[in-house]
Regions:
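Active-site-proximal beta-alpha loop/turn segments in soluble metabolic enzymes
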Residues: 202-207, 244
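Short, small-residue-rich loop/turn micro-motifs
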Residues: 197-202, 238-241
Length: 244
């Protein structure tokens, strides 16, 4: 039996899909599952990330929340869930829903159906201005593990100016990421590296496997790189980088 979920964005007026549980981005007073975040810390300048990057970020947030909300033990085989996710999407993304659904099937081992609805993507959750006179040449994901640390060091040793992007949902992980980023700043200088730590938390989280977290990390990195123009590269120094 499939479970229907509806991701609602701030300011959206339409009614949710029938019988669908709602997930929302902290809409005040909403009777639904709140996804807590500080996405307003993400950059809206020098350039506002385009609708494709913002749409992908919203989709990744919805997928990650659904992955956390629905316990695998409730599935018929205690693993493979049937998930129907209704989500806001800019027009270019609507045609990609079948391809993204197949990607998610492979990534999480579930049966996904994405139901995009055409709506304007309010950029209001991306608000921060870039605080430095210099601009980065690259963005790198920075989980705080050894691979991401070595990847950042490799890029800095190559002379690049860098934004390292972290995601956390509890304080201990945030402190590890902040401590490592501070060490990079001390060694290479504050004009070479900037750390962007983004909090995304979902209090309703009975499921712990979370295979979709890599998609959310990728979406956060893409939205960050998009704020600095098409020439800004995104690096993913994870899972084996240190062995290269």
């Amino acid at each position: 039996m499939s479970v229907q979920l509806h991701l609602r964005v701030p300011g959206e007026k339409g009614r949710p899909a029938p019988l669908a549980a709602q997930i929302h981005l902290e809409a005040p007073g909403a009777a639904a599952y709140p996804l807590h975040h500080d996405l307003e810390e993400m950059f809206a300048s020098p350039e506002l990330p385009g609708t494709a990057a913002r749409g992908f970020l919203l989709a990744a947030l919805g997928v990650w929340a659904a992955d956390k909300l629905l316990p695998r033990r409730a599935a018929a085989d205690a693993w493979t869930r049937q998930i129907v996710l209704h989500l806001p999407a800019p027009k270019p993304w609507s045609a990609l829903a079948p391809d993204l659904s197949r990607l998610l099937n492979f990534l999480t081992g579930d049966d996904w159906t994405l139901k995009p609805r055409a709506t304007g993507i309010d950029p209001g959750f991306l608000k921060a201005a870039w605080p430095h006179p210099w601009r980065p040449q690259a963005v790198a994901l920075f989980s705080g593990g050894l691979d991401s640390l070595v990847g950042a060091i490799d890029l800095l040793e190559a002379g690049k100016r860098l934004v390292v992007v972290s995601r956390y949902d509890f304080g201990q992980l945030a402190s590890i990421q902040q401590g490592l980023a501070a060490a990079l700043k001390r060694h290479y200088g504050p004009d070479r590296v900037h750390h962007l730590g983004v909090r995304v938390q979902f209090p309703e989280s009975p499921e712990l496997t979370l295979r979709s977290r890599s998609l959310l990390y990728l979406a956060l990195g893409l939205a960050t790189a998009a704020a600095f123009g098409d020439g800004t590269l995104l690096y993913l120094p994870e899972n084996g980088w240190v062995s290269h």
